[in-house]
């Protein structure tokens, strides 16, 4: 939680129970609980929130360097674990993606995938939350007040290698120069932030879609789909229209 308390790994958790029942267990990707995972035969997780590009990870042996995009890496590790598991035992895998957590940094290969499409603005883009539940207006998650230069890619992520940085700069630098020249303010600035957010967010989600697809196709190809329960859940996203609460 936001107080950064350490998860109590001595308590009963469902991976522990399944492990005791004979399941192979693994967690790969986002963890964000400070304490090391317990109840897993294999784990490799991101320290804290992790980063999108070339993320360091941690497993039972210590820190691990990786190269590439975090959503691809988590999926690659997940597929590798499934393929090497003991096929005589049932298994549970928690494939936990960082994306699309803030700052919504897309896979380099997906930059511009939507060809600068102009996205329709929701009628609630300038909502003042006056007719909403009190908690909605108190949350710090608006395009007007909350967005930072890093959120809208006016700052390049420091984790990029030279090749990744070149692609990043080729995409963002001319668009950022046009933004700086326009010197936007007020509602025009909110509108620009909305378009930038949508392009980045959807490009980031595209990688999740692609990689969930890879995982499902693997289950089908290996004859595991009919006997495997897949649970998909997510908890990320700014207000982009519907927020009645």
Residue ranges and their predicted role:
Residues 1-245:
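Formylglycine-dependent sulfatase
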């Amino acid at each position: 939680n936001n107080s950064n308390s350490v998860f109590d790994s001595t308590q009963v958790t469902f991976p522990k129970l399944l492990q005791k029942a004979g399941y192979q267990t693994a967690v790969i990707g986002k963890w964000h609980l400070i304490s090391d995972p317990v109840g897993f035969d294999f784990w490799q997780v991101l320290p804290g929130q992790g980063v999108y590009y070339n993320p360091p990870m941690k497993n039972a042996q210590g820190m691990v360097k990786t190269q590439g995009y975090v959503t691809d890496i988590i999926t690659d590790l997940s597929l590798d674990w499934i393929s090497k598991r003991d096929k005589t035992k049932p298994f549970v895998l928690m494939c936990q993606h960082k994306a699309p957590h803030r700052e919504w940094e897309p896979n380099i290969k997906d930059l511009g995938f939507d060809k600068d499409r102009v996205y329709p603005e929701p009628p609630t883009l300038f909502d003042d939350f006056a007719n909403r539940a009190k908690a909605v207006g108190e949350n710090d998650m608006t395009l007007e007040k909350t967005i930072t230069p890093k959120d809208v890619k006016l700052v390049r992520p420091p984790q990029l290698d030279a090749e990744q940085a070149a692609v990043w700069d080729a995409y963002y630098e001319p668009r950022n120069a046009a933004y700086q020249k326009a010197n936007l303010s007020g509602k025009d600035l909110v509108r620009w932030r909305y378009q930038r957010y949508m392009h980045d967010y959807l490009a980031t989600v595209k990688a999740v879609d692609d990689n969930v697809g890879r995982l499902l196709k693997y289950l089908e190809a290996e004859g595991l789909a009919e006997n495997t329960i897949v649970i998909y859940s997510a908890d990320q996203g700014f207000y982009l229209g519907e927020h009645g609460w």
